[in-house]
């Protein structure tokens, strides 16, 4: 009976090892991608968003950095990323905040941590992100009554200052294809800011980005 029990234990451990090796062999590849994105962003103004909606205009920017895919199973990966991105928003002329047309641009470092689910060459991913604003500028267009003004935004406790740290969530999908020795993924993603980034009124980042992700194709 003891001998039989020992044999059963050995068989269980052997089965576990085989399963782990199989998962490792057939899981998604672990890789590092170079990321280049086109980003369209705007602000949601919280309780004032309905009043300002007709004045809002998107700001185009760029995003570049790196994306690490850690394959865990054939259908699931963990994806931490690090990149530099430009966000912001525009209010058209006659808006109730700046009167003249104004544009805010924020220059940030961003770290998303995503869960990615694979379906052949397609995938979907979502997860939280943390961002830090290095600097930014607000430009107010000129008029006969108000001169043009471009100033660097501040990050103190003053009424018109901004907050450096931001948290939010991202969700999107992508498609992977191969070209010669490169693996290329096209990724479309929406970003939803969860924290207010300014002191004087509600401002939450919103953004849509289309990115190209390139890594060396596995043989």
Residue ranges with predicted function:
Residues 34-38, 64-72, 82-84, 111-117, ...:
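Residues on the lipid-exposed face of transmembrane beta-strands in outer-membrane beta-barrel proteins
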Residues 43-56, 86-107, 134-165, 198-200, ...:
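Flexible, solvent-exposed loop segments that connect beta-strands
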Residues 27, 73-75, 119-122, 178-180, ...:
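Outer-membrane beta-barrel channels and translocator barrels
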Residues 157, 166-169, 174-219:
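Predominantly the C-terminal beta-signal and adjacent terminal strand-loop region
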Residues 28-70:
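Short glycine/proline- and aromatic-enriched beta-strand/turn motifs that initiate or cap beta-hairpins
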Residues 39-43, 85-89, 131-135, 191-195, ...:
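Structural signature of outer-membrane beta-barrel domains
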Residues 1-35, 212-218:
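Bacterial Sec-dependent N-terminal signal peptides
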Residues 28-30, 58-62, 105-109, 120, ...:
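Residues that define the transmembrane beta-barrel architecture of outer-membrane proteins
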């Amino acid at each position: 009976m003891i001998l039989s029990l020992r044999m059963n234990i050995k068989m269980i451990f052997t089965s576990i090892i085989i399963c782990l090796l199989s998962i490792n062999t057939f899981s998604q590849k672990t890789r590092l991608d170079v990321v280049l994105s086109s980003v369209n962003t705007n602000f949601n103004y919280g309780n004032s968003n309905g009043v300002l909606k007709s004045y809002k205009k998107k700001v185009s920017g760029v995003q570049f950095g790196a994306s690490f895919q850690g394959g865990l199973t054939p259908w699931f990966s963990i994806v931490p990323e690090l990149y530099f991105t430009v966000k912001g928003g525009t209010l058209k002329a006659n808006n109730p905040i700046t009167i003249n047309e104004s544009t805010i641009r924020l220059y940030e470092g961003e770290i998303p941590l995503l869960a990615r689910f694979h379906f052949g060459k397609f995938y979907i991913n979502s997860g939280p992100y943390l961002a830090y604003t290095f600097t930014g500028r607000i430009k107010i267009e000129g008029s006969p009554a108000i001169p043009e003004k471009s100033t660097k935004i501040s990050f103190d406790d003053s009424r018109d200052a901004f907050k450096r740290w931001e948290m939010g969530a991202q969700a999107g999908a992508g498609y992977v294809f191969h070209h010669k020795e490169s693996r290329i993924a096209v990724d479309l993603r929406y970003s939803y800011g969860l924290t207010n980034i300014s002191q004087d009124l509600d401002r939450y980042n919103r953004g849509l980005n289309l990115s190209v992700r390139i890594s060396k194709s596995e043989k």
